[in-house]
Structure formats: C-alpha cells, structure tokens
C-alpha cells in the first residue's frame, strides 16, 4: 500500500489565497464514476488555461505538474493525499491520464490535487470536483472516503501581481480592457475643500448585458489595483468632547393625550 501524506491546514494558512485562474479543471466531472475492477482505474484529467498569455500565471510559464489523489477533509480539517501519481512533470498539453491501482484505495469519493510550479518561482494548487471510485479493493481503515462536500479552495503563492504588472495597464479605462485580469486606477484621497459647483461624469457610461443562462469560466478572473504612490497625512482632532446632558425630562412632558370632540363622535356613529 502506498504511504499517504497528511496535508495539514495549518500549513496551508501560510499560503497566500487569491483568485487563481491558471488551471481550470474540466474533467473529471462532479459525481462521475470510474471502476478499478480491471486491476486499475484509468482517469483522464483535462484542464484549460483561463489566464491571459501575458500573465505570470499563464500555463505557458508552467515548469512542472504534480498530481495527487486526495480525499477528506477529516473531522480534524485535514485532507489526505496519496503519493503523487505525477511528480513534477512538464506537461505540454492540457491533459494527463493517470492510473490508480485497484489495491491502493477502497471504494469511495475522491478528488485530484494539481500542484503547479512556475518559472518565476510561484506555485498554485487546484482541486478537481469529487468523483467516485468503484471496484477498488484497498484497505478501508485509513482514508475518509465518504465525504461528499466541497473540495478545498484553490491557492496561489509567489505572485506579486501589483508590482509585476505593466504600469501602462492601469491607464487603460476599465471598460475598454478585455483580458481575464483587469487593472483599476490608483485610489486617490479627497482634497481639503470642495471647489466644484456642478458635477460631471469622469468616464462615459457603458452598456450592461446580462446572462440568460449559466456561464462557464468568468470573463474577469481578477482585478489589480496599484498601491498608493503618496503618503496620506493625518492630524489629531483637538476639539473638546461634548459634555453629557445636564437635564432630563419625563416622556409625559412631550406627549399629549389624544382627544375627540362630541360632534366627531356622533358623526362616526352616523357613518
């Protein structure tokens, strides 16, 4: 039996979480079933590159892929991954067929972890949807294979997009940008006084369209905003604190009792 690795969530906390758009796993599908009754379960994993070609997370910049079969998380919040099926392999295409030996795992629900290293030193981790393995004969005491909930979130580390982005990208109006990654202008601070007497639109209006059916991958995966190129100044407010009230009054002094005239009463009976 393969010795599986326990990946602790406490270690994952150190990884910077952000919107990760490089590996968009298209198969296996959620709930899909694969059988190992022939001696092994053969599964083709496919994915798309949903990032821009000029992005550091484009798969054109990928160095190696590590693919592991995982399950969980356990009641302690840990995921369980077997020894990698693919170890830091350079994959030219966007698919890889893996074989899972029949005697390595029991029947149950699993997902793939795809760990990608990039030329700039960055890394990403992606998880496929859960699928079901049947016809397996591996030991049942070590893996939590009954979990059917959501898989862990995608993760990325080592991509300082705010500093590596082309500064010219921030000068293009947002509505005119077309890439998966968009660039917003730097946030400005308000002035000390208002001098304008009329208002005007800073940018022209743009059309809005809505999806009529469920869409596939997002049109925009991430928006990058540059840091401030200035230092915001602040000052202490030396105004005295307002004193507590010195007079209280009962509510009855501010409430008057409702009255109705005799003529109004008679009119109500006649109506």
Swiss-Prot record:
Pfam families: Kre9_KNH (PF10342), Kre9_KNH1_C (PF05390). It comes from Candida albicans (Yeast). GO terms for biological process: (1->6)-beta-D-glucan biosynthetic process; cell wall biogenesis; fungal-type cell wall organization. This is Cell wall synthesis protein KRE9. Residues 1-21 form the signal peptide. Belongs to the KRE9/KNH1 family. Coiled coil: none annotated. Involved in cell wall beta(1->6) glucan synthesis. The keyword Signal applies. The keyword Thylakoid does not apply. It is found in: Secreted, Cell wall. GO terms for cellular component: extracellular region. Keywords: Cell wall, Cell wall biogenesis/degradation, Glycoprotein, Secreted, Signal. O-glycosylated. Its main location: secreted. InterPro entries: Kre9/Knh1, Kre9/Knh1-like_N, Kre9/Knh1_C.
């Amino acid at each position: 039996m393969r010795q599986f690795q326990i990946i602790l969530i406490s270690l994952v906390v150190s990884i910077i979480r952000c919107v990760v758009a490089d590996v968009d796993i298209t198969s296996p599908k959620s709930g899909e079933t694969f059988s190992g009754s022939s001696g092994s379960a053969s599964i083709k994993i496919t994915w798309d590159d949903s990032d821009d070609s000029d992005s550091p997370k484009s798969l054109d910049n990928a160095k190696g892929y590590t693919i592991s079969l995982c399950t969980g998380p356990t009641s302690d919040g840990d995921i369980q991954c077997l020894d990698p099926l693919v170890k830091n392999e350079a994959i030219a295409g966007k698919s890889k067929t893996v074989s899972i030996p029949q005697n390595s795992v029991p029947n149950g629900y699993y997902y793939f972890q795809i760990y990608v290293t990039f030329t700039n030193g960055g890394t990403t981790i992606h998880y496929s949807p859960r699928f079901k393995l049947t016809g397996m004969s591996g030991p049942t005491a070590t893996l939590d294979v009954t979990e059917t909930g959501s898989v862990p979130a995608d993760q990325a580390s080592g991509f300082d997009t705010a500093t590596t982005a082309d500064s010219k990208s921030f000068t293009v109006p947002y509505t005119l940008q077309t890439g998966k990654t968009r660039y917003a202008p730097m946030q400005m601070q308000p002035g000390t006084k208002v001098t304008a007497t009329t208002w005007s639109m800073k940018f022209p209006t743009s059309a809005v369209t809505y999806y009529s059916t469920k869409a596939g991958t997002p049109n925009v995966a991430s928006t990058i905003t540059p840091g401030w190129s200035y230092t915001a100044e602040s000052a202490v407010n030396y105004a005295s604190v307002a004193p507590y009230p010195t007079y209280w009054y009962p509510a009855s002094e501010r409430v008057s009792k409702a009255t109705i005239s005799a003529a109004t009463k008679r009119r109500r009976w006649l109506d």
